[in-house]
Curated annotation (Swiss-Prot):
PANTHER family: NUCLEOPROTEIN TPR (PTHR18898:SF2), NUCLEOPROTEIN TPR-RELATED (PTHR18898). GO terms for biological process: mRNA export from nucleus. Residues 39-56, 636-645, 729-751, 981-994, 1068-1087 have a biased composition (Polar residues). Residues 881-892 have a biased composition (Gly residues). This is Putative uncharacterized protein DDB_G0293878. One of its GO terms (molecular function) is structural constituent of nuclear pore. GO terms for cellular component: nuclear pore. It comes from Dictyostelium discoideum (Social amoeba). Residues 19-38, 57-91, 153-187, 227-283, 416-445, 555-564, 572-635, 648-661, 680-700, 780-810, 849-880, 995-1067, 1088-1118, 1225-1249, 1257-1291 have a biased composition (Low complexity). Residues 703-720, 1362-1373 have a biased composition (Basic and acidic residues). It comes from the Eukaryota.
Length: 1441
């Protein structure tokens, strides 16, 4: 066929020449560039044979050009240097495969390859996929070097791919295409896959490349030459620019490139055409045809294997593959990032299965290949695939390990050792006579065997490149025969090596999370949870164990069943981490040995180690496990239950073995976080750190009872320490609080534990965690246990939990002031005596964790004065805390006593939050964010709950906040919806990125808003308001959402600061409130940093005292007005959208009315800040805020606070109620601000007015605006759910408004404020009527949804409101689906006196049970979801994301 002469780039000639000339170029190692263009060998002989004969005949003038094409000069094996380099590169997997000869000798069939009859496009697709994965090759990889170096030809060993191709060609029924087509196929596949992938990925970023690595030995020439020429002309240059090393060709390599091209131009043209065809295939990759074929290919590619061997499913059953597939499905980003991991898993697992296939197909290369060739005719020997696999290994390792190479090498060394062990162990396959050393040496030795007849043949082919092609073909066929034999041997060996490698990789993957910092672990845990959401309720550990090896299963079953039964989902995961990690440490070790070890370690360690917090402790320890892969899997992968010294010791051992390796790979706590940890640990280590570390040491076989005893003892010890710390605790004195536990845990476990090696510290921490989980677990009433107690008292278990429950009950019984006083005292005592434990594995986690931990720590450990001053540690630890305590320093310490009220509330909040964190406050684990060490395994279940089964998790773990009215409110766990929103840590898979954990952390922070819900505990007086704070609880959980959303908004704030610290700190001090936090820290005060700063500026709470001032109405109103107006303006100035979200968290509002008002101002301001999107958008918000304060927080208990629309003066009753209203008003205020803005712009207020329907027109608008704004700010999340639904502004608003109206029945009362559509809703909400009312708003919303969140109509608060809508709608939409049903759900479930269910509603939203419904009802919801991840980064992430 006449091929278009490919455009000759400068490199094109040489490229073609070298491709033509270099048979070696066929190997990726030699002709990296040549491989791109010319290698004929590469394409699967079978695939080439049947389809490619056509395509070859079409695209390539003659199949027999195998002899004519210099690419037929196949190195018998990939260059030994490459193999050795690969081995040397620590590309263990590759090295396992790269017995250069052995690798080629490995049956390509055993080497996973495309089905024999792949269409050229399929082959191209596979190549593209492979090339896409090939891009993973590190520049250091020998292949990349070879690929880039022309001297690669000179390397002693010929590229594997070339011999593989001819070998395949030589295979029965395989026609060795002599045409440069083969050459073209091979060179491209042989081309350093990284280059190919880079080029292809650049050209074709299709997910297929990333998604499914397909063997590259596909004939790229399958596409018609002219098409390929056309496309390749476009794409040939990049390939040609990578000059393939000119290999000795029959045509003299001495010829000038022009001469060579002229002499070889037919071949080169063919090759170029083929390359062009390849590229055209690549170009056509984007085409549905190609992709469809590719998909068919893949199905064929996989199915033949599964058909050939049912074991193909085995890798599918492989927990890692399974996990990654699930994660891949659920997390496209992660799938992309992990796709390489998935594909090597496929490959490895298939290889593993193929190993047995090899055994069955056996030494007969032809017969084995034939028998197996049904599934695979493509030569797995194709070097490009080896390189690809190497690259995939690198890629997987690099992606799995942020520091893939160093860790990869370390882990490869460990894996090589482990592979030697495993291979020696696994060398039972009988392949291992050679395989004993294959992993480390055997392959290298094998590949190093230039003496092998294959290499001799290859060399002869190389050197004989001038010899007649027939001779070359004969030699090549002989070489292929030898290679087939060797490949069968090597392939078996490599299968073992790969199997072992796969296990190693799985172990590493398991270990990697351990090595990974807590964020990454949390992300991995999130992935685990994400994949096993349905399983999560039982416990990821159980799941992981079940999915893990039977041994892991057995042990995990024991451990899981122990705590798993009641601790299931929430504590169970943590307890599974603790107990299961204790019991399952071996099981986790077993699981570590198993793929489930990855899952169990990831699940138990990561899921349970949402105890990633626990794992972080182990993390520092476990990362060492990476080198001791087996030990790590057996030991470290359990990633210490946070005091599960079994694994902890082992991880420590492995840690001792290779902490250095882990360090580059592990996302260790940032130095800031370490500093925080150190700062925290300075205090917390004093308390419990050493004891915890000491106790945790040798708890390898710690039984649950033993752990409980140890925990009790450690709790007693910590009570001794923490008792002094919390000596002023009302009911918690003498028993370490959860904060104490966090502080001690953080102290011991921050950054892997300050005393990471102090296993006793882990032990005690684990014990505390176990006891805490037990306490949670034992606290049958979610009310008392979830409300304050579990969080407050972690270690004593049920005792301290009961104490806290009693304390909570007392608090609920006590007046708000008494509670506040007690909590103030406790907080003061805690803050004075206990160190603040701020932990963050990453800056964001630090911020988030610091935020939350700062809450707890500042609340629990340090007095606000110490927060003011001591928080300087916190300040240094949590930057926003610094701002909070520093800026609030004077005022904060001045208002410290007031803040202690608030902080006492905050202690309750903190306890509540801790409980929330434990219960689901933070995917990272509220404790994790709090301790950051993962030591507090209790937190990990909540992350699991959030990430996995929102509803089930919420149901199980959402702390039931005992409202002061005695009503129970589930604090909705906020799932890290922002998971997809990228996080600062991209080392972890994107959806695993800190935003997920940070979202969890913001959930922690929003556990400050679960301080709001906790404030529901604290504000049991303010219960309905707190329920409106449960709207704030929803805001708490919605603030969790706001933290999640505010993680999204914190992501927004993360935009402001992916420094979750400030946001977290802000959220922490959202509850922390108050003036202190506000004045002290932007983030601390109002929950968002800039937001807080504006709050701080506007709120400063004027004086922290003003918040605390009994003149709540006066100060709060004036202050709120001032703060709101100022804050709104400031927050407008502050980029407070995301900060506003955090400020929404401030909505936690110390239940101290003043504090609440302060918080309300902060909350208002923070809501204004939350609404600052709206506020930023709605500059009228000050005015509007004043209006919207009309919103009454509590319909029943609290009179509607008719704050002057202009003055926000709380006309109503209790300062607390007012403050709660104010906080509610803050929610509604900021919402009202938005609504006022909307009210001011009543056109959108009509939409908002429907939103206003729910709340007062103002509050509804506020909610709607907050819905609009708090779409970004779930903070308004009674409105926030509405806000989230305010993406579905009207419908969700109505729903949410209904919910909010349910919760905010009173808000319905203040229907004035220009809510056109305002309709006061009593506790009962008329969804249909709402919907009818909302039809307009809904129409608006839909318009907005249709035209974008920023499309004006939906919210008319203004451009900023739209902006918030764009953010909030996305966020809202992200939640809004559940919001619809949540309304009715809230009606029934949230029938508590305070229709606080909005938080439950939000909780439900978090669960997202109705999310789809809302999505159904609201187009923007999907749209928002589609944009959520995008907006997450933009705005710090949409709220729910």
């Amino acid at each position: 066929m006449g091929f278009l002469t490919p455009k000759k780039t400068k490199k094109g000639k040489d490229k073609n020449e070298s491709n033509d000339n270099s048979f070696d170029g066929g190997s990726s190692s030699y002709n990296n560039n040549n491989n791109n263009n010319n290698q004929p060998i590469t394409y699967t002989p079978t695939a080439i044979r049947s389809p490619n004969n056509k395509t070859m005949s079409q695209s390539q003038t003659s199949i027999p050009t195998l002899s004519s094409s210099p690419s037929l000069n196949y190195p018998s094996s990939p260059p030994n240097n490459n193999n050795n380099n690969n081995n040397g590169n620590g590309n263990e997997v590759i090295s396992i495969f790269n017995n250069s000869n052995n690798y080629n000798n490995i049956k390509y069939t055993h080497r996973l390859s495309t089905p024999p009859a792949l269409q050229p496009q399929q082959q191209q697709a596979i190549k593209d996929l492979l090339s896409s994965t090939a891009s993973t090759y590190s520049s250091s990889s020998p292949f990349s070097k070879l690929a880039t170096t022309n001297g690669g030809i000179s390397q002693p060993t010929t590229p594997i791919s070339s011999p593989s191709q001819p070998f395949q060609s030589v295979q029965p029924n395989l026609i060795i295409p002599t045409t440069p087509t083969t050459t073209t196929t091979t060179p491209q596949s042989v081309q350093p896959i990284a280059i190919q992938q880079q080029q292809q990925q650049q050209q074709f970023p299709s997910t297929i490349q990333n998604t499914v690595p397909i063997l590259q030995p596909l004939a790229l020439n399958t596409i018609k030459p002219h098409q390929q020429q056309q496309q390749q002309q476009n794409q040939t240059q990049p390939l040609q620019q990578q000059q393939p090393l000119p290999l000795p060709n029959q045509q003299q390599p001495n010829q000038t490139p022009l001469q060579q091209q002229q002499s070889q131009q037919p071949n080169q043209q063919q090759q170029q055409q083929q390359q062009q065809q390849q590229q055209s295939l690549q170009n056509s990759r984007g085409e549905g045809e190609f992709e469809n074929k590719l998909k068919k290919n893949l199905s064929v590619w996989v199915s033949p294997v599964s058909n050939k061997k049912n074991k193909l499913n085995h890798w599918q059953s492989c927990s890692d593959l399974e996990l990654y597939n699930k994660l891949k499905i659920r997390e496209p980003e992660f799938a992309q990032s992990m796709s390489c991991a998935i594909s090597p898993f496929h490959y490895l697992k298939i290889q593993y299965d193929l190993e047995s296939i090899d055994q069955s197909s056996g030494g007969n290369s032809g017969s084995g290949t034939d028998s197996f060739s049904d599934g695979f005719k493509v030569d797995l020997n194709f070097d490009g695939y080896t390189e690809w696999y190497k690259g995939m290994n690198r890629k997987v390792k690099n992606r799995i390990h942020s520091n893939g190479k160093s860790h990869h090498k370390a882990s490869n060394d460990a894996m090589n050792n482990n592979n030697n062990n495993n291979n020696n162990n696994n060398n039972n396959n009988g392949n291992n006579s050679n395989n004993g050393n294959i992993n480390n040496n055997g392959i290298n030795n094998h590949s190093g065997e230039d003496k092998s007849p294959l290499k001799k043949m290859v060399k002869s082919l190389k050197s004989g490149s001038n010899s007649s092609k027939k001779e070359q073909q004969q030699l090549h066929q002989q070489l292929l025969a030898a290679q087939q034999q060797q490949q069968q041997l090597v392939h078996q060996q490599q299968q073992l090596a790969q199997q072992q490698l796969h296990q190693q990789i799985q172990k590493q993957i398991e270990i990697i999370p351990i090595k990974v910092n807590d964020e990454q672990k949390q992300h991995l845990d999130f992935l685990r949870r994400h994949e096993s959401k349905s399983v999560v309720p039982t416990s990821p550990t159980i799941k992981g164990v079940q999915s893990g090896a039977g041994g892991g299963n057995t042990g995990n079953t024991d451990g899981v069943n122990i705590d798993n039964m009641s601790l299931d989902d929430d504590n169970n995961n943590n307890n599974n981490n603790n107990n299961n990690n204790n019991n399952n440490n071996n099981n986790n070790n077993n699981n570590n040995n198993n793929n489930n070890n990855n899952n169990n370690n990831n699940n138990n360690n990561n899921n349970n180690n949402n105890i990633a917090v626990n794992t972080p402790t182990t993390n520092a320890t476990i990362p060492t496990n990476n080198s001791t892969t087996n030990n790590t899997n057996n030991t470290a992968t359990p990633s210490v239950i946070n005091g599960d010294s079994k694994q902890q010791e082992q991880p420590q051992q492995s840690q001792q073995q290779q902490p250095q390796q882990i360090t580059p790979n592990t996302l260790l706590l940032s130095t800031d976080s370490i500093d925080l940890l150190n700062t925290l640990n300075k205090d917390s280590n004093n308390v419990d750190n050493n004891n915890n570390n000491n106790n945790i040491d040798d708890n390898n076989s710690v039984s649950r009872e033993e752990m409980e005893n140890i925990l009790k003892k450690s709790q007693q010890d910590s009570n001794k320490d923490l008792g002094s710390v919390y000596g002023n605790e009302d009911s918690n004195s003498g028993s370490p609080t959860f904060q104490d536990f966090q502080s001690s845990a953080a102290a011991s476990n921050v950054s892997g534990g300050i005393d990471d090696k102090s296993q006793t510290g882990f032990k005690k921490l684990g014990e505390k965690i176990l006891s805490f989980f037990r306490s949670r677990k034992s606290s049958d009433s979610l009310n008392s246990s979830n409300s304050n107690i579990p969080i407050t008292n972690i270690s004593p278990g049920r005792q301290s939990q009961q104490q806290q429950q009693q304390h909570i009950q007392q608090i609920s019984q006590q007046s708000q002031q008494q509670i506040q006083q007690q909590q103030q005292q406790q907080y003061v005592a805690r803050t004075q005596s206990s160190s603040s434990i701020v932990y963050s594995s990453s800056a964001q986690q630090q911020q988030q964790q610091q935020q939350f931990q700062f809450q707890q720590n500042s609340v629990s450990s340090q007095s606000l004065q110490s927060l003011n001053g001591g928080n300087n540690n916190n300040n240094s630890n949590s930057g926003s805390i610094n701002g909070g305590s520093n800026s609030g320093g004077g005022g904060v310490s001045n208002s410290t006593q007031q803040l202690p009220d608030q902080m006492g509330l905050f202690n309750i909040f903190t306890q509540q939050q801790q409980q929330l964190i434990m219960n689901g406050g933070l995917g990272v684990g509220g404790i994790n964010g709090l301790v950051g060490t993962g030591v507090i395994g209790g937190d990990s279940p909540p992350p699991l709950s959030r990430s996995q089964s929102h509803a089930s998790f919420q149901g199980k773990f959402a702390p039931v906040i005992i409202m002061e009215d005695g009503s129970l409110h589930l604090t909705p766990r906020i799932l890290p919806f922002n998971v997809r929103g990228g996080s600062t840590n991209r080392t972890t898979p994107p959806f695993l990125t800190p935003n997920t954990s940070q979202t969890n952390l913001s959930s922690l922070v929003n556990n400050n808003n679960n301080n709001s819900s906790h404030s529901n505990n604290n504000n049991n007086n303010n219960n309905n308001t707190n329920n409106k704070n449960n709207n704030n609880n929803t805001n708490n959980s919605n603030n969790n959402n706001n933290n999640n959303n505010n993680n999204n908004i914190n992501n927004n704030n993360n935009n402001n600061s992916n420094k979750q610290t400030a946001n977290n700190t802000t959220n922490d001090f959202s509850f922390d409130q108050n003036t202190d936090l506000r004045s002290s820290t932007n983030s601390l005060t109002i929950g968002s940093n800039s937001n807080f700063s504006s709050l701080k500026n506007s709120l400063n709470l004027e004086n922290p005292e003003n918040n605390n001032n009994p003149d709540k109405n006066v100060d709060n109103n004036n202050f709120i007005n001032e703060n709101r107006n100022v804050e709104i303006n400031n927050e407008k100035n502050e980029n407070n959208e995301s900060n506003n979200n955090d400020n929404v968290k401030v909505e936690i509002v110390q239940f101290d009315s003043i504090n609440v008002n302060s918080n309300n101002k902060s909350l208002k301001n923070s809501f204004n800040n939350n609404n600052n999107e709206n506020i930023n958008n709605n500059n009228n918000e000050n005015e509007n805020n004043n209006k919207s304060v009309i919103y009454k927080n509590q319909q029943e208990e609290r009179p509607i606070i008719h704050i002057d629309d202009n003055n926000l003066n709380i006309e109503s009753v209790n300062g607390d109620k007012n403050s709660l209203r104010n906080s509610r008003d803050n929610n509604n205020s900021s919402s009202n601000n938005n609504n006022n803005n909307l009210k001011n712009s009543n056109s959108n207020n009509s939409l908002r007015n429907s939103n206003e329907k729910r709340d007062l027109n103002i509050s509804n608008n506020n909610n709607n605006n907050n819905n609009n704004n708090n779409n970004n700010n779930n903070n308004n999340n009674n409105n926030n759910n509405n806000n989230n639904n305010n993406n579905n502004n009207n419908e969700n608003k109505n729903k949410i408004d209904i919910d909010n109206n349910k919760s905010l029945n009173n808000s319905n009362n203040s229907g004035g404020g220009g809510s056109k559509n305002y309709r006061s809703y009593s506790n009962d909400y008329d969804l249909q009527e709402d919907i009818d009312r909302m039809n307009f708003n809904k129409l608006q919303t839909e318009i907005k949804q249709i035209f974008g969140h920023n499309s004006g109509g939906h919210r008319s608060s203004g451009g900023s409101n739209r902006h918030k809508d764009s953010i909030g709608d996305k966020e809202m939409d992200y939640y809004s689906s559940s919001d619809e049903d949540d309304d009715s759900m809230d009606d029934s479930l949230l029938s508590s006196p305070d229709p606080s269910p909005p938080h439950i509603f939000f909780f439900k939203t978090i669960h997202q049970p109705n999310k789809q419904n809302v999505k159904k009802s609201f187009a923007p919801l999907k749209f928002n979801q589609q944009n959520n991840s995008n907006n997450n980064d933009d705005l710090g992430g949409s709220i729910l994301e």
